[in-house]
């Protein structure tokens, strides 16, 4: 929690820096706390509670830039911390691209509360939290003789920050989160010990799904029994909403100013170019009330806005912060996306599977990588073989390979099943003609 006294301290620290040799500065005061209760076979295994608060300050001194942080918030100690930071910055190389954003780009306030904080957070009983985790385990224990172990957990936390810049920005944000999970390992064929999990998370305690988590984890792991490789070849690939973000991540990483400026992005010079199918429609929706990831300003204080990332497969924007915009000589956009929503289709996962004659449903990625310069990728996967619209065999120890642009150009369908508790609301995805290596 950020108090009024905390804010006054931050404002004093800003003034002190400007009066002691610093021409410009930005400051972040933060306060975070979290708790987790981890159980093994319904018995307490690990309890963890943590809280931290601190101050980070970026100093612009004689054309040079340095960033420093401390968790010692006594005024006297902050005086020496700031003075030492200013002196240290003077030893650094000049960098004319290190400037604060133009003040006209800052969020000026006046919009409704985004409703990201649950006041109930402070009144929850630890015994109730443990009971939620224990209930998830008890849904599993004794339900199948092949069960080896059952893990379950409950966790929650709060995050708060207060930001200032010397050229006029002031902003505050706070949020809460709650989560419950279960994981189950069972005895499979021979030495096989498949495992799986399930979880739910929410920004408000009353919206957290607290039952059925263990049951779902057990259901998922039992479906893995008898896993083996399928034949190598080209398949229609479906990726479930738990894992679709794995394929979106390399695409987004290629849009950041740092990658573009270093010419290490496979989407360099692709603005307003078609790099995916017409089904690729991705929006940044930062102002959705009560949604994880919603915010009115980014980490520079720049006002967020609704913006298309991809429209019918065409790239519409990059994520270019102030520093990289100066380095590249282009206009800045935003430092990072907030809440990403891929336009959904009209079928759930079962409906998508029913439409596929020969395919693989991917329910997990196991290692691998994507080359950020070329977009070439290779990932280990597990999931299910699809024949004539039905899941006929669990598979594992297979690899999927290709190129990100080629892959997203082969996107033929999108589900209607995104996880609404995520920063990335990405439904199930269907790609045609994807290369798999197996047996």
Kindly label every feature range from the protein language model.
Residues 268-439:
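Dual-mode signal for accessory low-complexity, basic/Gly-rich regions
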Residues 1-295, 302, 311-314, 338, ...:
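Active-site bordering "gate/hinge" segments
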């Amino acid at each position: 929690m950020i108090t009024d006294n905390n804010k006054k301290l931050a404002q004093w620290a800003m003034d002190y820096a400007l009066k002691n040799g610093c021409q410009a500065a930005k400051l972040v005061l933060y306060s975070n706390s979290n708790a987790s209760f981890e159980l093994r076979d319904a018995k307490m295994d690990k309890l963890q509670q943590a809280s931290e608060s601190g101050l980070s300050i970026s100093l612009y001194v004689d054309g040079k830039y340095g960033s420093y942080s401390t968790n010692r918030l006594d005024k006297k100690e902050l005086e020496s911390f700031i003075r030492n930071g200013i002196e240290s910055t003077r030893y650094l190389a000049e960098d004319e691209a290190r400037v604060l954003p133009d003040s006209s780009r800052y969020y000026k306030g006046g919009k409704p509360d985004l409703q990201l904080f649950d006041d109930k957070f402070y009144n929850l009983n630890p015994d109730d939290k443990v009971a939620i985790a224990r209930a998830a385990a008890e849904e599993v224990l004794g339900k199948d003789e092949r069960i080896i172990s059952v893990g379950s957990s409950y966790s929650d936390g709060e995050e708060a920050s207060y930001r200032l810049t010397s050229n006029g920005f002031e902003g505050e944000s706070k949020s809460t989160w709650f989560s419950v999970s279960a994981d189950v390992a069972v005895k499979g064929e021979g030495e096989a010990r498949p495992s799986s999990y399930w979880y739910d998370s929410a920004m408000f305690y009353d919206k957290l799904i607290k039952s059925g988590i263990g049951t779902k984890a057990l259901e998922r792991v039992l479906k893995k029994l008898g896993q083996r490789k399928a034949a190598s070849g080209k398949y229609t690939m479906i990726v479930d909403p738990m894992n679709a973000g794995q394929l979106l991540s390399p695409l987004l990483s290629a849009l950041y100013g740092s990658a573009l400026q270093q010419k290490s992005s496979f989407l360099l010079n692709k603005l307003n170019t078609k790099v995916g199918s017409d089904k690729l429609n991705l929006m940044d929706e930062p102002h959705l009330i009560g949604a994880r990831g919603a915010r009115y300003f980014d980490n520079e204080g720049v006002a967020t806005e609704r913006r298309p990332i991809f429209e019918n497969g065409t790239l519409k924007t990059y994520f270019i912060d102030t520093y990289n915009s100066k380095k590249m000589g282009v206009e800045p956009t935003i430092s990072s996306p907030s809440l990403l929503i891929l336009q959904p289709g009209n079928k759930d996962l079962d409906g998508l599977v029913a439409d596929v004659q020969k395919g693989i449903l991917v329910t997990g990625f196991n290692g691998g990588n994507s080359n950020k310069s070329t977009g070439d990728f290779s990932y280990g996967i597990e999931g299910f073989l699809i024949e004539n619209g039905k899941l006929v065999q669990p598979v594992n120890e297979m690899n999927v390979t290709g190129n990100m642009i080629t892959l997203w150009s082969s996107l033929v369908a999108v589900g209607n099943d995104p996880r609404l508790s995520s920063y990335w609301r990405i439904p199930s995805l269907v790609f045609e003609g994807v290369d798999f290596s197996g047996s």
